């Protein structure tokens, strides 16, 4: 039995708690949240046993000798201290993304987990989405032919963050999916953006002199020359959650706004006739997907990794660290008007 504590039961943490309570191999022994009234609501909502420790101080967990693992769903600025302490207590850790806001901190935590022989996993939920898993299988089967480029759009009208810009708020999902589908990480990145709403800010984390970017355009270049282009914006009423990879034989589209058919394979290619390029073999195929809540799969993968003493391959601490490195490089590019920033992936 895995004894786990959930730190942070806000908008996302409450779903982590729900999923861990449903797993037969898990015993939730503690819940931490800075708001006492929130803990009271959670206790009633889930009818928590009187033995479950409810506390506003995460340091109280140190005294729980039976604690095996910790799930952290708090603001990213708190992750480094929380994860480090949990690992030093001898606990396996599942952390909400991003792992931290700085690559050096991420790498330090990965090294600590390795030294302590503990599991460090990051909750990149999209990597457990059936459509993402199905899309990876399509690419591995070579059904798109020669890959040409990728594109994604993640736009909506709010919420507008006051601690990080649209890049840090939105980009990590699509970058994670492209990396997963391609089996590669970028060798260079570029980003440009615009600020309208918060042109001056007192925050010091991942902001530029012009403020928090509301619109960001991202370019990722991979080792084989493949490029992916991402449109990010939180002031666009046209809500989009769309990602695609274009190949010589067709295009694979993951559209989260189409719940009945989120993964589609659009077939088509060109036939040359003299000076013309004529489209041929055009068709559309909606791909069958497995069912299941992605977050439930995140939680069960974390528990299985602990029980089997094996690091999760899909969303390990190292995967989370690589994504933070990419976001940091994109921030550098954004602050230097789109300068090409090489990545050291060693």
Predicted features along the sequence, with ranges:
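N-terminal Rossmann-like dinucleotide-binding module
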Residues: 1-48
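Conserved SAM-binding strand-loop segment of SAM-dependent methyltransferases
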Residues: 51-57
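Beta-strand-loop-alpha-helix segment that lines the small-molecule cofactor/substrate pocket
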Residues: 64, 69, 75-127
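Glycine-centered short loops/turns at secondary-structure junctions
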Residues: 90, 117, 225, 337-338
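A contiguous active-site-proximal alpha/beta segment in oxidoreductase catalytic domains
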Residues: 100-162
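C-terminal glycine/acidic-rich active-site capping loop/insertion
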Residues: 125, 206-208, 247-318, 339-342
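Rossmann-like dinucleotide-binding domain that binds NAD(P)(H)
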Residues: 158-227, 232-238, 244, 318
């Amino acid at each position: 039995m895995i004894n786990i504590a959930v730190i942070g039961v806000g908008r996302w943490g409450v779903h982590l708690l729900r999923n861990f309570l449903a797993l037969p191999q898990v015993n939730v022994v503690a819940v931490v949240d800075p708001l006492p009234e929130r803990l009271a609501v959670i206790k009633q909502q889930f009818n928590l046993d009187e033995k479950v420790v409810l506390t506003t101080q995460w340091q109280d967990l140190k005294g729980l000798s039976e604690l095996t693992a910790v799930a952290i769903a708090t603001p990213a600025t708190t992750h480094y201290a929380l994860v480090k302490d949990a690992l030093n207590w001898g606990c396996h850790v599942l952390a909400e993304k991003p792992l931290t806001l700085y690559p050096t901190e991420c790498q330090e935590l990965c090294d600590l987990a390795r030294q302590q022989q503990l599991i460090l996993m990051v909750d990149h939920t999209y990597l457990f989405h059936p459509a993402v898993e199905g899309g990876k299988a399509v690419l591995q089967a070579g059904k798109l032919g020669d890959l040409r480029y990728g594109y994604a759009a993640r736009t909506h009208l709010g919420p507008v963050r006051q601690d990080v810009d649209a890049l840090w708020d939105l980009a990590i999902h699509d970058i994670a999916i492209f990396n997963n589908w391609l089996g590669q990480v970028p060798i260079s990145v570029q980003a440009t953006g615009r600020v309208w709403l918060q042109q001056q800010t007192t925050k010091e984390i991942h902001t530029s002199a012009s403020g928090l970017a509301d619109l960001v355009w991202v370019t990722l270049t991979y080792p084989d020359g493949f490029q992916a282009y991402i449109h990010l914006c939180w002031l666009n009423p046209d809500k989009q959650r769309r990602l695609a990879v274009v190949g010589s034989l067709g295009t694979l589209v993951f559209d989260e706004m189409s719940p009945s058919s989120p993964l589609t394979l659009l077939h088509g290619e060109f036939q040359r006739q003299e000076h013309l390029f004529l489209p041929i073999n055009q068709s559309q195929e909606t791909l069958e997907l497995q069912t299941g809540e992605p977050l439930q799969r995140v939680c069960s993968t974390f528990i299985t990794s602990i029980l089997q003493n094996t690091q999760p391959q899909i969303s390990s601490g190292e995967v989370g660290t690589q994504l933070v490195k990419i976001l940091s490089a994109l921030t550098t590019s954004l602050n230097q008007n789109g300068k090409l920033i090489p990545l050291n992936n060693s």
